[in-house]
Amino acid sequence: MVKEKEKPKNEIIIETENLSLFYTDFKALNEINIKILKNSITALIGPSGCGKSTFLRTLNRMNDLVEGIKIEGNVIYEGKNIYSNNFDILELRRKIGMVFQTPNPFLMSIYDNISYGPKIHGTKDKKKLDEIVEQSLKKSALWDEVKDKLNTNALSLSGGQQQRLCIARTLAIEPNVILMDEPTSALDPISTGKIEELIINLKESYTIIIVTHNMQQAGRISDKTAFFLNGCIEEESPTDELFFNPKNTKTEEYISGKFG
């Protein structure tokens, strides 16, 4: 049972200003302007190839790993442009974490999956690591299922458990924002329901931006939805408003299934 959505805080944590992205000569994102509120869930929807996943990756500079990328415009996180020359990218990716479409646990124990990030960032004390592992697994609603087998290989978990483990691994390094790229697309309905409930619970402490092809999912969990088409945001508004009273003809056609 997914609990009722609470209103987000009226405080901007991320803002993009005329953000464009080029793959060599191809313009994949075209002057994106959007404000993300703290402790909110923002859903990004649109047909395949519309730019929503590309946009998501600009928010913690994951696109830097792709050759031939050029960025124009700004991404402001907590008042600073993350594309400025002196911005600490490692710290950025700690504060803005990422959960991918396919669960990708490391080939190591459940415990080591969670403790890996904190160790990299300097936490060595075993008692502190134990605490981080337990709290991260509790926040991801996985602790009760794995507390007696923390030394078991993470790949022994089910797909849904692996995805919650990946969320726990992200939480372990204390992010402020969690980016999710279709985190339930490879999961069965029961596992999907657990992840959705988890996402809503996480909103109390984190800001979440999620790419989803599932419009029903966007309706169930998000506060605001942005509809992407051809590298642009065609429309963004509170989720209920966008789905039940869209202002843009293309939005209405997409959510009614006329294309996509």
Swiss-Prot record:
Which EC numbers does the record give?
A: 7.3.2.1
Q: What is its main location?
A: membrane
- Annotated membrane topology: Peripheral membrane protein
The UniProt record gives the binding positions of ATP as G46, P47, S48, G49, C50, G51, K52, S53
Q: Which NCBIfam families match?
A: 3a0107s01c2
* Pfam families referenced in this protein's UniProt entry, alphabetically: ABC_tran
Nucleotide-binding in keyword set: yes
The opening ranks of the lineage are:
Bacteria, Pseudomonadati, Spirochaetota, Spirochaetia, Spirochaetales
A GO molecular function assigned to this protein is:
ATP hydrolysis activity
Q: What does this protein do?
A: Part of the ABC transporter complex PstSACB involved in phosphate import. Responsible for energy coupling to the transport system.
* Family to which the UniProt record says this protein belongs: Belongs to the ABC transporter superfamily. Phosphate importer (TC 3.A.1.7) family.
- Keyword Nucleotide-binding tagged: yes
Query: Subunit info?
Result: The complex is composed of two ATP-binding proteins (PstB), two transmembrane proteins (PstC and PstA) and a solute-binding protein (PstS).
GO BP, sorted A to Z:
phosphate ion transmembrane transport
Provide this UniProt record's keywords sorted from A to Z: ATP-binding, Cell inner membrane, Cell membrane, Membrane, Nucleotide-binding, Phosphate transport, Translocase, Transport
- What InterPro entries does this protein map onto? AAA+_ATPase (IPR003593), ABC_transporter-like_ATP-bd (IPR003439), ABC_transporter-like_CS (IPR017871), P-loop_NTPase (IPR027417), PstB-like (IPR005670)
Q: Which reaction does it catalyse?
A: phosphate(out) + ATP + H2O = ADP + 2 phosphate(in) + H(+)
Query: Taxonomically, which superkingdom?
Result: Bacteria
Task: Tell me the compartments it is located in.
Answer: Cell inner membrane
Q: Which residues form the ABC transporter domain?
A: 14-255
Kindly provide the name given to this protein in its UniProt entry. Answer: Phosphate import ATP-binding protein PstB
Entry GO terms, CC: plasma membrane
